[in-house]
Amino acid sequence: MVTRKGVAGFTILLALCVIVFGAYVRLTDAGLGCPDWPGCYGFVTVPQTAEDYLSVEQNFPGEIVDEGKAWREMIHRYIASLLGFLILLMFLKDFFSYRNNDGSLKDLKFSSALLALVIF
């Protein structure tokens, strides 16, 4: 059984990881390693094959793919996305707990505020 404290604790730890890794991405000047979002040069991951690089040249003229920077940026995006999903999970857990009279309104308000921050 996944407890609220366990999810909240892991979410806090992951938020710290996103902050630290975001600083690393920024300090290594990898923030534009993947210029488009949510993918990377039109791909789910960093372009890897010769065909991928041809597609990048056609769709992003003048862009040079730096795999190291691109991977750092994509990993940061993946970690941040996981954080968003954990906040959504926390909200859903609090919502259904409150609905079944097992949870508190305070917990639901807190997770609702976090979810609103992520969405907006």
Regions found by a protein language model. Give the residues of each.
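Aromatic-anchored segments of alpha-helical transmembrane domains
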Residues: 19-20, 118-120
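Hydrophobic, aromatic-rich transmembrane alpha-helices
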Residues: 86-96
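Extracytosolic (periplasmic/ER-lumenal) interhelical loops and adjacent juxtamembrane/interface segments
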Residues: 27-74
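Short, motif-level signal for alpha-helix interfacial/capping segments enriched in acidic residues
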Residues: 3-4, 53-58, 102
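Membrane-interface helix-boundary motifs at transmembrane edges
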Residues: 1-2, 96-108
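N-terminal signal-anchor transmembrane alpha helix
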Residues: 6-33, 38
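Membrane-interfacial loop-to-transmembrane alpha-helix junctions, especially the N-terminal start
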Residues: 6-8, 103-117
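Membrane-interface loop-to-helix entry segments
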Residues: 71-86
